[in-house]
Regions:
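Conserved catalytic cores of very large enzyme subunits
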Residues: 1-348
């Protein structure tokens, strides 16, 4: 309850679930980077960039043609040419492109880690690690919720494909309703589980640098802005070149059934697969957590999420009006703290 009160007052705390961490990392683990666990003094984490699966889904529609840069980025494959997206066809092509991406992704990370060891070996840091250390090969996923929602839209609604004069998919029109990730709907959450397991299965089938143990994460930190800028419109209704959702959080504004429903959807993911970490952001207006009753409900939310085997959650407790006023008058908010990702920062 004391920690929750600090969250309400300062937005400066993140919560990690021991019961999820211990089976993989043991009792003596540390948090490295932002939210990832590591065996203290016994492990090296080889980390690299994230795989933008939202962009990969668009490659499935356009046969590897990049809708933004107007170049062929992958093998020239058959495009989806139907007026409406067919779920089975999309899944088949998307699965192929995820396999292609996993191969390139792991090979590039292998090269990065080899060159890092060759030209920037961290001798001082290595002196603090056991000789017989473990090595984890950390990968990551970006655009997660948008892919889940896109597949759900194609499966449960009708998605019309909008193409430019060259036949390249540039936008989508959705007809009908569909379940979205983050609303405690098993239909969407099953697609989320499928996506995570399918892509990670492709990662761990590849040879990794120094036979390190593959792991994955869904923790974009702030890179979701950059990945979104590089990605066209997606079938879930997200506009072209706008940020993708941060970390494992639902798409912005689409978790309409409340924080408990969003937390339940996130907790349904197999966090022993995504062992390198998930980053789950939630935002509250201060009035929602005011007083003793508000604080007790807040504590109950955190405990319930962890009881459901969720891994990580953090909160921004600040009003929109405060943030807008801080933008306009930063001199009045020199001590305003916001939770960015796995770290806090002064807003101004």
């Amino acid at each position: 309850k004391y920690a929750a009160k600090i969250s309400v007052d300062t937005s400066s705390i993140q919560y990690e679930n021991d019961e999820v961490m211990k089976p993989e990392w043991g009792d003596d683990y540390s948090i490295c980077c932002c939210v990832s666990a590591t065996k203290t003094g016994q492990e090296i984490q080889l980390f690299g960039a994230r795989a933008n699966l939202a962009k990969t889904l668009l490659y499935a529609f356009n046969g590897g043609f990049d809708e933004k840069h107007r170049i062929q980025c992958g093998p020239k494959m058959e495009r989806i040419t139907s007026e409406y997206a067919d779920y089975d066809e999309v899944i088949e092509k998307f699965d192929w492109w995820m396999d292609w991406l996993a191969d390139i992704y792991v090979n590039v990370l292998n090269l990065i880690h080899y060159m890092h060891d060759k030209y920037y070996y961290e001798a001082a840091e290595m002196a603090l690690i056991n000789n017989d250390c473990e090595r984890s090969f950390a990968t990551g996923i970006a655009g997660f919720s948008h892919v889940v929602d896109s597949l759900s839209a194609i499966k449960y609604a009708k998605v019309k494909i909008i193409r430019d004069e060259e036949g390249i998919t540039k936008d989508f029109e959705i007809e009908g309703d569909f379940p979205r990730y983050g609303n405690d709907d098993p239909r969407a959450d099953e697609l989320a589980t499928w996506l995570l397991r399918t892509f990670f299965d492709k990662i761990r089938r590849r040879h990794t640098y120094r036979d390190s143990k593959p792991s994955t994460s869904i923790l974009t930190i702030t890179s979701n802005v950059v990945y979104g800028e590089a990605t066209g419109a997606t079938p879930d209704g997200r506009y072209a070149h706008t940020p993708v959702a941060d970390g494992v959080s639902p798409s912005a504004g689409k978790d309409v059934n409340g924080p408990t429903a969003a937390a339940t959807s996130v907790s349904r993911l197999d966090h022993f697969i995504v062992s390198n970490g998930t980053l789950f952001n939630q935002k509250f207006h201060p009035s929602a957590l005011a007083g003793r009753e508000g604080l007790e409900k807040f504590v109950a939310l955190i405990r319930t999420f962890f009881d459901q085997k969720g891994m990580h959650m953090q909160f921004n407790v600040v009003s929109r009006e405060t943030l807008l006023d801080a933008q306009a008058h930063p001199e009045n908010y020199k001590h305003l703290v916001v939770r960015v990702a796995g770290y806090s920062a002064l807003f101004t």
